A protein has these predicted regions:
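Residue-level detector of short, conserved catalytic/binding motifs and their immediate flanks
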Residues: 108, 149, 234
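Metal-dependent nuclease catalytic regions and adjoining charged, substrate-binding loops involved
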Residues: 138, 156-254
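Metal-dependent nuclease catalytic cores in nucleic-acid-processing enzymes
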Residues: 75-84, 139-168
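Non-catalytic surface loops within mature trypsin-like serine protease
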Residues: 114-116, 129, 191, 240
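Metal-dependent nuclease catalytic cores that hydrolyze phosphodiester bonds in DNA/RNA
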Residues: 1-124, 131-135
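Mid-sequence acidic-hydrophobic segments that form the walls
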Residues: 84, 113, 131, 154, ...
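Soluble or luminal CAZymes and related metallo-dependent hydrolases
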Residues: 69-73, 143, 193-196, 200
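Covalent nucleotidyltransferase core used to form phosphodiester bonds in nucleic acids
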Residues: 128-144
């Protein structure tokens, strides 16, 4: 063991700001490769998708940190699963596949290329990260499944795989501390549910396409509201532009 000498250590907030700006620029440049058409993720928060195309929201420090970690971890996951050498950022949420029948671009995080009765076009995978300390319940994972279900619908698959990388999972073996741990889940639905979800997708795509074309208040208001955790003055830079009905101006959403 080496004994450290006396050191002067001072936090440098200017350097931190510079790092955020550098990361923000890199993320913006990477985003230029994204397919400009409607993406699977646009369907989760349709109003946000509309307003972001009219007034691009600049990333703040929080968003920059979250997107950066997510993009890097997805790149490592994709590279490892595809058994590639080095690190590949290709197809990390850029919309690598266009589905004409649904009218969306999408890029599932990985795909098990097997063909079966339940999965005629392969089994799609979705990777999510979580900083939760406690084990998550099925109810907790609802927000993780929305995008996976879009991939399953596009692939006409009755089965999908959800992988959650728990960054702060407790070390139950040692009884103390935390370390990143995988949780893997198989997700299934019926043919009826698959077809119903496809119709939901088509309906939302139709509404978003029309709103983007007409830009009228009437058509914008026809778009489904965004997920609650993505909405609100503190969570969305378009809050005062969107003014979502039943939320804007109410006590709960101030």
């Amino acid at each position: 063991m080496l004994t450290l000498p006396k050191l002067d250590i001072e936090r440098n907030e200017d350097a931190e700001d510079a790092l955020v700006e550098t990361t923000k620029t890199w993320l913006a440049d990477e985003g230029k490769e994204r397919d400009p058409r409607i993406h699977a993720s646009d369907l989760l928060d349709p109003r946000k998708a509309y307003w972001n195309r009219q007034h691009k929201e600049e990333l703040d420090a929080r968003m920059t940190g979250n997107f950066f970690v997510g993009k890097v971890l997805h790149a490592f996951f994709s590279t490892a699963m595809n058994k590639k050498k080095g690190l590949s950022l290709v197809d990390t949420d850029v919309g690598g596949t266009w589905d004409k029948s649904l009218g969306i671009s999408f890029s599932n995080d990985w795909e098990k290329k097997i063909k079966s009765k339940d999965s005629p076009n392969g089994i799609p995978y979705e990777l999510k990260t979580s900083r939760a300390l406690n084990e998550q319940t099925k109810k907790d994972m609802a927000s993780y499944l929305e995008q996976l279900c879009i991939y399953m619908a596009a692939k006409l698959s009755l089965v999908g795989r959800l992988v959650v990388l728990r960054l702060m999972a407790k070390d139950n073996l040692k009884g103390w501390g935390t370390y990143p741990q995988y949780r893997a889940y198989e997700v299934r639905w019926t043919k009826k549910s698959l077809n119903e979800y496809r119709e939901q997708i088509k309906s939302t795509v139709k509404l978003l396409t029309k709103a983007l074309k007409t830009k009228t208040k009437k058509d914008i208001k026809m778009l489904p509201l965004c997920r609650e955790w993505k909405c609100g003055k503190g969570n969305c830079g378009h809050w005062d532009l969107c003014k979502p009905e039943t939320r804007y101006g109410t006590t709960k959403w101030k």
